[in-house]
Amino acid sequence: MEDLDFPICILKMNLQCCEDFPSRVKKLLRQVKGVYAITIDPVKGLILVCGTAEPSVLIKAVAKLGQSPQLYAYEKDPATAKTRFRTLLKRYATNKTQDKPSPPAPPVTATTPVETCPAGGETFRGFGYPGPTTMMQMPAFSLPPPRGLPGWLAPPTNPRLKYEEPKVTPRKPPAPYPFDYYENLGFPPSDSLFNYFSDDNPQPCSIM
């Protein structure tokens, strides 16, 4: 990185949430246009980027993993950037010799909260387990409150109407007409000579 004549941007964030988180950050920054060199220090939580990309673009790219990094330093002049970069490396080398070994981490139990990585990893619990504060939490789903019977089984509020059968009116008996009322009487007898002597004529003429 010291051989490149480009601005240097230093971002600071937590890189020890999981083992492969630094490699994911580096892989994501390589896709940003204008980035030519990347140096990551997971212990100190520093990301050193050399290139022409703006710090806001780098912060926005890293924020896709679930954590938003802070802008620690930015030097646009390449000559001044090299000097500040060498000074920063010397200061870190001095601090590493003075650092004491940290005590071993306590064993993880059921009551000990496990630090999870926003981008996934070995310690990522999955759905239903608590995640980091910067990660979007899933809403808690619960059963709906108990209710009464559904509408088609619940008793009606208004009393039902009593069903009544329609009244059937009996037919009237026929009127007492004479027996031969519906018979065909035929045409009246014609006034002819044959009718005078016919047996069907109630008033025939008889020859004496």
Curated annotation (Swiss-Prot):
GO function term, MF aspect, one: metal ion binding
Family: Belongs to the HIPP family.
Organism from which the protein derives: Arabidopsis thaliana
PANTHER family in the record: HEAVY METAL-ASSOCIATED ISOPRENYLATED PLANT PROTEIN 33-RELATED, HEAVY METAL-ASSOCIATED ISOPRENYLATED PLANT PROTEIN 42
Protein name, as recorded: Heavy metal-associated isoprenylated plant protein 42
Keywords of this entry: Lipoprotein, Metal-binding, Methylation, Prenylation
Modified residue annotations for Cysteine methyl ester: 205
Metal-binding among keywords: yes
UniProt cross-references to InterPro entries, sorted A to Z: HMA_dom, HMA_dom_sf
SUPFAM superfamilies: HMA, heavy metal-associated domain (SSF55008)
Residues excised as propeptide: 206-208
Functional description taken from the UniProt entry: Probable heavy-metal-binding protein.
Disordered as annotated region, ranges: 93-116
CDD domains attached to this UniProt entry: HMA
Lipid addition sites, S-farnesyl cysteine: 205
Domain HMA: 6-70
Keyword flag Disulfide bond: no
